[in-house]
C-alpha cells in the first residue's frame, strides 16, 4: 500500500492522484515515510493529509478486527471542515448528510427553556465569512452521524488505494536516532518501520511508555455516559415515543438535577446520551473505558426509569479526566501522538472529533515544511531528516489549544448538569446553550502552520519568544491541573467565571 517494495502502479497513483475519483491532488513528494497506528478519525485524516502533502504513507494498522462503527452523534466544527475544500468528494457527501435541525433545551419537567437554537458558528456573520473564502464551507450541521462521517473517511482512504491492516496490535513503540527511523513491534513478533510513526491509537497508547515512561493516571469526573444509536423505527414502535416525537426531526437537551440527556431523532436514526452523576448509579454499575455495546436497557432504567432501546446496544463510558501532558513527541522526535492518544476529551467539550482532525492536518503540514529542504535533493539518505523538527513544531502549535479546549468541557458540563437558577435562564435562555467559542471554530489549522512555522522554528532552535494565537484572545496561558479545577468546582465556583480573556 505505497511501500517501495510494491508495484509502481500504486506509487504513481499516490503521486498524481486520479481525477476520475474526485480525489485531491498530492503535493510534490517529500520522501518521508509515515506509519500510522490507529484507524479512527485522527488516523484516517492523517493518512489523507499526509498523502496530500506528499508524504509516503507506508501503512495503517488497527487493533480492531474491522471498522468500529460504535458511537452515535459527533460534532465537527468549522475549523476541521475547512480542509474539505481540498477533498471535493467528501465535501459533497458532507453537504448531502448535514443536519440542519435546530436544538431545543428542556428542563426535566418538560418546560421548554430555549429553542430552536443553532450553534453560533452558524450565525449569519460567520456563515458569510466562510462563504467568502474560496471553497469555504458556509453552513455546518449542528451534529454529524458518526457512522456516516467515519464511513466517508474510510471511502476516501480507499479511493487513494490505501488498505487498513486490521487485527494488528502494537506491543511497543521504538525509535533509532542513528538510523533516522521509528517503528512498532507487533504482538505477532513482526516489526514495522518508517521515518515517523503516528500514534493515533487512543487512550493508553503504548506510545506513552516511549514518550513519558508511564501511562497518565486517570481521575473520575464524577460522571459517566450511557449512549446508543439505533434505527428510529425501533423507538417509534413505542406509543409514548410516537406521541411525543413521532414524525419529528429533533435534537434536544434535557437538563435535571445531577443529570443531563442529549437526544436525537430523525426518520432514520434514534440516539441518546444520558450523563448522570456517579451518585445516581448502582454501586455495581461503575463504567469501564470500552466502546463495546454491552449494556442492557434494564441498567439504564435503573438510572432513568425507562428506555425503549434494543438490548445490548448501549455503551456505558466513564467520563474520566487526564491531566494534559505537554510532550506528545518521543525524545528523538520520530513517534508523535495525535487525537485521544495525545489529549483525552469528554462529550461536553463538543470538540473531541474536531481536535483529532485538526491534529492530523497540523501534523501533515508541519512535516511538509520541515521536510522541504531534504525533498529538494530527492530520495536518499536525507529523506526524513526534518521529521523531528516537524513533530516538535506540531506539538508546540497544538498543546495550548488542546488545553484550553479541555477547560471548555467543564464549562459545558456545568451549564447542562448543574444549572439551578431557572429564573435567570428564563430571562436569558442562551445561558443554557452549549458553548461553541469563536476562537475555536474560526481557526484554520493548515493556514496556522504556514503562518506560525517560522516563529515556532526560531523558538525551538534558538529560544526566541513565541505566542500561540489559536487560543482565546487576551488569555494568559498557564498550565493547569484537574485537581485545581475540581477544588474550584467543589467550592461552588463556575469555571466560566474563572476564565481570563475572551472565551466567547
Curated annotation (Swiss-Prot):
FAD binds at residues 146, 340, 353. Keywords: FAD, Flavoprotein, Monooxygenase, Oxidoreductase. Its cofactor is FAD. GO terms for molecular function: FAD binding; monooxygenase activity. Its EC number is 1.-.-.-. SUPFAM superfamilies: FAD/NAD(P)-binding domain. It comes from the Eukaryota. Pathway: Secondary metabolite biosynthesis. The active site is at 227. Disruption phenotype: Impairs the production of neosartorin and accumulates two isomeric metabolites, moniliphenone and 2,2',6'-trihydroxy-4-methyl-6-methoxya-cyldiphenylmethanone. Belongs to the paxM FAD-dependent monooxygenase family. FAD-dependent monooxygenase; part of the gene cluster that mediates the biosynthesis of the tetrahydroxanthone dimer neosartorin, which exhibits antibacterial activity. The two different monomeric units appear to be synthesized by the same set of enzymes, among which the Baeyer-Villiger monooxygenase nsrF is the key enzyme for the divergence of the biosynthetic routes. The pathway begins with the synthesis of atrochrysone thioester by the polyketide synthase nsrB. This is FAD-dependent monooxygenase nsrK. It comes from Aspergillus novofumigatus (strain IBT 16806). The lineage of its organism: Eukaryota, Fungi, Dikarya, Ascomycota, Pezizomycotina. The gene is nsrK.
